UniProtKB/Swiss-Prot annotation:
WD repeats: 118-158, 163-203, 211-251, 256-296, 307-347, 364-404
InterPro entries: Histone-bd_RBBP4-like_N, WD40/YVTN_repeat-like_dom_sf, WD40_repeat_CS, WD40_repeat_dom_sf, WD40_rpt, WD_repeat_RBAP46/RBAP48/MSI1
Residues of the site described as Important for interaction with HAT1: L273
Function comment: Regulatory subunit of the histone acetylase B (HAT-B) complex. The complex acetylates 'Lys-12' of histone H4 which is required for telomeric silencing.
Organism (species): Debaryomyces hansenii (strain ATCC 36239 / CBS 767 / BCRC 21394 / JCM 1990 / NBRC 0083 / IGC 2968) (Yeast)
Keywords: Chromatin regulator, Cytoplasm, Nucleus, Repeat, WD repeat
Protein name as it appears in the record: Histone acetyltransferase type B subunit 2
């Protein structure tokens, strides 16, 4: 296990909140060995608002390591140049069933920055193109979109365009159609751009969606239908759009209890399931078949999950395990949810720890979680970043996973 933290000092303010954060962090470190196969912490000079594992990796069987790459950004608050950063690290294979051997082997998971690409403002999100991972898009604090070639020598963007008039966080490459890029912004719009029609000076904007009445916080492509995408906004709406009929959404969901909806994720396993992360700290599970075409209607809500204590910032379904969802929040927590446990009966002592679908809580960050990413080639492995300048890379422990399997077997036996 690697715990290579450079934890920033909390300062001399004796407020109850800071003392609580410090004590919680120390307790988390103490219990890491019981929860993780490995966990590493790396301090950055500036916080990163974005993280994503790149699919490129190299396995070293002899050393029991995987050479991995990550995308990070910077948020310098105007005090320094902002960059898209390409980072390298090593993570363990964790194939050994010998716990003592695993715990005694040193793993150097310190993140190293191997390339930097300049950007005009803080990078809110950076994502690689699925069909060509060497091409990366970013959206920044001015709503500007930049494309970079990770494999080239150019240290600046290969394309720069300004479809928005304000800060933006929504950024999603189509998994179906090469070059199709969705962006969403505080200017209340979602824009679809065809980056494959790039020449030296021009990008082709396919269409702009202007239905939302407030800040659009996120937009994501559907995992099964190449024509569908979803968007969420401070106007409390989730909209499902069809790019073949631009204009009004084909269906919608209204969330009256929340101050807004911050993020969404479509399931890669169930074509009708979408999760939304809300400003009121809850997560909504929706059935897209049951959504309404009318305004101010909440049809389609399957279940509400409660476990966070502050606004949801990021949401992503596992690419490996059906029904496993990760959420990050302003409350400094990252929660893994097992949707197959929704509605299970609980003993009273278990219910006090949370709802049955709350699978695990990662409590190692000392600042608001800004983004998370499932590793695409290694089960149960996640990268997460927070505004405390710390990057966490971690894999859920086999002990925890086996304990869950044991419970399932016991229930089966009882039936």
């Amino acid at each position: 296990m690697s715990l290579e933290a450079e934890v920033p000092e909390l300062g001399q303010d004796d407020s109850q909140r800071e003392l609580t954060i410090k004590e919680e962090y120390q307790l988390w470190r103490k219990n890491c060995r019981y929860m993780y196969e490995f966990v590493s912490e790396t301090a950055l000079t500036w916080p990163s608002l974005t993280i994503q594992w790149l699919p490129e990796n190299k396995t070293n069987e002899a050393e029991g390591l995987i050479d991995a790459k990550l995308l990070l950004g910077t948020h310098t608050s105007g005090e320094d140049t902002n960059y898209l950063k390409l980072a390298s690290t090593q993570i363990p294979l964790s194939n050994s069933s010998n716990t003592e051997e695993k715990s005694n082997k040193k793993v150097t998971s310190r993140i190293k920055i191997t390339k930097k690409f300049e950007n005009n403002f803080e990078i809110n999100r950076a994502r690689y193109m699925p069909q060509d991972p060497s091409i990366v898009s970013t959206i920044n604090g001015a709503g500007e979109i930049d494309l970079y070639n990770l494999g080239g020598d150019q240290k600046t963007a290969i394309a720069h365009f300004t479809p928005h008039e304000d800060n933006g966080y929504g950024l999603s490459w189509s998994p179906h159609k090469k070059g199709y890029l969705l962006t969403a912004s505080d200017d209340k719009t979602v824009v679809l751009t065809d980056t494959s029609r790039l020449d030296a000076t021009d990008l082709s904007q396919v269409c702009k969606f202007t239905t939302h009445k407030d800040i659009v916080n996120d937009a994501k492509w559907h995992q099964f239908d190449e024509s569908l995408f979803g968007s969420v906004s401070d106007d409390k709406y989730f909209y499902l759009f069809d790019i073949r009929t631009p204009g009004e959404p084909v269906s919608k969901f209204y969330h009256p209890e929340s101050e807004g909806i911050n993020s969404l994720s479509f399931s890669p396993f169930s074509q009708y399931l979408v999760a939304t992360g809300n400003a009121n700290s809850n997560i909504s599970l929706l059935d897209t078949r049951k959504l309404s075409t009318k305004s101010a209607v909440s049809d389609g809500l399957l279940h509400t999950m409660m476990g966070h204590s502050d606004s949801i910032t990021s949401l992503e379904f596992s690419p490996h395990k059906d029904g496993m969802l990760a959420s990050g929040s302003q409350d400094r927590r990252l929660i893994l949810w097992d949707l197959f446990k929704v509605g299970e009966e609980q003993a009273q002592e278990d219910a006090e720890d949370g709802c049955p679908e709350l699978f695990m809580m990662h409590a190692g960050h000392t600042g608001a979680v800004t983004d998370l990413s499932w590793c695409p080639y290694k089960d149960w492995t996640i990268g997460s970043v927070a505004d405390d300048n710390i990057v966490h890379l971690w894999e859920i422990g086999k002990t925890l996973l086996n304990a869950e399997k044991g419970i399932e077997l016991k229930d089966t036996d009882l039936e």
